[in-house]
Amino acid sequence: MVTPEKLVSLALEAMDRAYYPYSGYAVGAALLCADGTVYQGCNIENASFTPTICAERTAFFKAIYDGHREFTAIAICGGKGGKIAGAFPPCGVCRQVMREFCEDDFKVYLVNGKESYEELTLADILPHSFRPREHMQD
């Protein structure tokens, strides 16, 4: 079983792989699939900014490519120069990607330090969200 603490540790490890020459912010994420598999992601920046991808989406897209569709938790960490200075919440685009594949009770661990984190849910960070079922055809 992957504990929240292990997920946090894997997010911190992923942050070390970030490519962030433009913003100066390194971000790492560790995504827990329902079957216990963990996917790590980091932010990867680009000079034109639009093709930049966040750590959370990197982890999700790797997992989705490998066939996973059910997720239980994600740990996210980040900070200027790769130094954690407090919780680093996901951007709006990443929250909407989470909504596409996760239920309200999906756990979101925002890392505050090497050994501390804040536990939230998707419902906490994305209330009144636009859900995939609103697009579904009968």
Where are these regions (language model features)?
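Basic/polar N-terminal segments that are highly enriched at the extreme N-terminus
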Residues: 1-5, 136-138
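Short, basic/aromatic recognition patches
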Residues: 5-20
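Small-residue (primarily alanine) positions within well-ordered alpha-helices
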Residues: 11, 29-30, 59, 63
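Charged, amphipathic alpha-helical segments
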Residues: 4-9, 91-95
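Short beta-strand scaffold segments in enzyme catalytic cores
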Residues: 24-32, 109
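Zn2+-dependent cytidine deaminase-like catalytic core
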Residues: 40-134
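Short glycine/serine/threonine-biased micro-segments
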Residues: 22-26, 39, 90
